Amino acid sequence: MRSICWIALFLSLATFATAQTKIDSWNEFAKTKFEPKYYEKMGEYLFYPNFTKELKALEGKEITVQGFYVPFAPEDGDYIIISKFPMSQCYFCGGGGPESVAEINFSKTPGKFQVDDLITVKGKLKLNADDMEHVNFILDDAVLVSK
């Protein structure tokens, strides 16, 4: 009986610890504040991110993000974009901003996706504040968890 109590205690603590490390990626991304700065290359003002301390602490760590596939054809074709919102909600028309999209660099090609496929990916978070050719939230070495 005593060993059953210890096992139950251990399992409940393990479950609690796992729950504590799970994050809502989109919610964390949404805490990012943006400020306009002049971007010389384009000759106009663009919004640059000020990442939170909590988000900076996640950089380089593996996170999971679930989002909708956005049809985007980069010239080199080695990454995809997912959004918190489906295209049918027109994420770029006002409901979402730069905090609602993530760039996914797969470790191996996962196959083809259709517009608004809801996918879950896992990868190492990279925060991008300066390269305007890419989005602010990037998952490197990503793998497809579910489609």
Region locations from a protein language model:
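Sec-dependent N-terminal signal peptides
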Residues: 4-14
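OB-fold and OB-like single-stranded nucleic-acid-recognition modules
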Residues: 19-147
